[in-house]
Amino acid sequence: GPDRPTAVFAANDLSAIAVIDVAREMGIRVPEDLSVIGFDDVPEASRRAQPLTTIQQPMRRLGSVAAEMVFSLLAGEQLDELHVTLPTRLVVRGTTAPPPESPGR
């Protein structure tokens, strides 16, 4: 219907894959009717018949920064930053498209 969303940004890739599966069961076409984006770029995201558009984050760097912070805290050191921002990358694959045209939008 006209109030149906045109896109879903899921918290992670596995949730995005579940959204795609449910959408298809409901007769909703991805990406023609609904764009779906995940987060993490897990291996399954690129191996599907319709590869998932996702946000890739530097997992190894994320782990090493977290470990460095834990070791600093265990050594009694004060952390300069409690929040660290690492770069991400949009990986466009087969589950996103411009929103469909419909009356009233």
Which residues does each PLM region occupy?
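Flexible loop/turn connectors
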Residues: 1-104
